[in-house]
């Protein structure tokens, strides 16, 4: 019945369409090029869609596209994916045309390959620049994998409720309606949605027209929306639901309409999103000096969503856990993530929506700026969160994935849908954001801000390339009194068009000299690999005689050369130590001569607070990674790390935790591993006493993150008090599940309780997981369940990844394996065997377009042995023909990282063992034991005083 109604209406809209038999014309496309030929472009779309969430098989639609040929042509080429074309009509769009009502349509071919090209032929040659309108009616399947238009579900009062929503970025607008699905081909969109009357919340990018609600078709209500501004097709969004909302209508802190839609009964959890979202938009408008363009910016929390969120212009869609805050359930980490994601998506309203990329080769023009501003703009609203301090930790994390030869550059040419999706990786996000932060500092913050304001105003509603950005910045630099050594495009082309990053080695030219000798090499985790890639590197430094970490402007530049460069440094001869790269604002590592490393270790162990906390984090991260790479003796890194027993700030400890996690992986099972564990317990003892399991009233925002690091180290590495306390807390929680257990420590407590293999603990937590509808609680539980050491329960958990009746949402299934991979060697090896055996079934069940890369990237951080290398080779050979571009890149990174770890064992294991045995073995046991007692007593006393 509904299908007949839809088809009847399509006939009325299209006039007298030519009926087609799809089987006779669905031909294999012969285009070698995935990019549209560019011989025509759209200016206007009128899209009508029929959505019924209860009829989950398919939906119908019609689209009328105003098309302008660039040249005289007899065909146009656009995109359509996984749909049946029902009819096509084409006619002249010029009132002066004598044949205005003539149907120009002749035939069409629809590619069955992944080009998704729809070629439409006409009865005559179309004149250049003379517009026509092409009307297409079609039937399409709801997307099975949350990319396109799809159905999501939730349970309310025991009944399943369905809704329709969408995710069209990057290449899935073509799955919603035939269109020119490339970001540069912008147009105005008019949308009409037909939906059953029971679905009271029907939304798209623009508000409803004043006379929009009409019941002109039985069983459907017609919702007509205002025309958009010129925009890309991937930014469209749809929602047909029974949601409720809160809004800023009665108490606005921002002058545009904002609503937050979510499941009925969850409106109280949307208050933070509404409040922070408005304040964040105000700050972004101030910063960019450019007003938000649409009349509304609504936010939607949906139960099933592939990404964390999507910046659709005017209707931003989020996964529930990325938007809703439940007091007593949402962790501090999740709350911070919500703030970051809201800021990220708000930023896209300028970087991506107002100014979009010319093609997905330049994904970073969207995602790099959104990554930078997700911290920077959050910091403008909530400075107490210390987001720009935490940014350095995120940069250090991306160093790991950027330190392999196979990594792609920031600007990376892509053509196929698989390649395009693969560009949405850590390079486009975290690396690009880090390079943008470096640019902010070497330009100065005010020149950077003015440059972005000029870029946005100049490129508004246009498709941009990096040259457009660089030219705007250069114009502002030229008008200022600030100078840089080269033109900006020369500097930035090396950072954006080459993969990887440098390690800058700095030495005194002589013991009493006033100059540095500086060289650069590409930093690669595998020390057996080499590269001649070089960069234009901004340099600044601090001397022990002039400790000023605040001025981060360049004091010199390192040219793009392998040869050594001499840099004059007045006063160097009087300095006991020096540090290059203030606040780690430059995207590079720094190595020194052994004498300077020893001097830095001394000052850290004596008076560490004289060094900026971000540079303390830098010294920890650089030293251990340089040692891992074979460029620094591990004994120097360990000597420096001793100071951590005095370190109270979270940021250096986050850097240290990453270094220690790698060492734990490569040392696990070795005879020296117990000594390494002893060292970690020694370093964390004062903080374990100070932080414990209980949160203090009014503690700093980042303290829960710090507490989790300390508790995880202690419970994992044998602190009996930590293990017994965690087990007691879990048992008390089981005995009284309604009691309050700080959500910030729940994953640690649950994980510790599961490591013992207790089946009852697992069953209790699994029952809670399946019973709760709260996405925050589900995340906590799923991340803990992977810690189980019970093989039977682990196998059951893994089965949920591929089971047809899985109780884990598709978007979360990859977390089952990731949590197991991260929990320890036994579960990691079990997960590897499971993936090796079942990857073909895993792909379509874990949000296959991105979930598998999350799993593979977790392996890239943890696999270390020759046995692992053999299994990955087997895995690669077995599934090579089904890998996506992103999966292939992840597998290549795994292989490089394993090779580096095998090299590590031959080059570094003996040095690490010698240092640990000297300091924590039989030879040093009595001295260390006495030192531990004295230091811990002193530190606890100091902490209690402070």
Curated annotation (Swiss-Prot):
The active site is at 345 (proton acceptor). It is found in: Cell membrane. Keywords: Aminopeptidase, Cell membrane, Disulfide bond, Glycoprotein, GPI-anchor, Hydrolase, Lipoprotein, Membrane, Metal-binding, Metalloprotease, Protease, Signal, Zinc. Substrate binds at residues 308-312. InterPro entries: Aminopeptidase_N-like_N, Aminopeptidase_N-like_N_sf, ERAP1-like_C_dom, M1_APN-typ, Peptidase_M1, Peptidase_M1_aminopeptidases, Peptidase_M1_dom, Peptidase_M4/M1_CTD_sf. Belongs to the peptidase M1 family. This is Aminopeptidase N. It comes from Plutella xylostella (Diamondback moth). The gene is APN1.
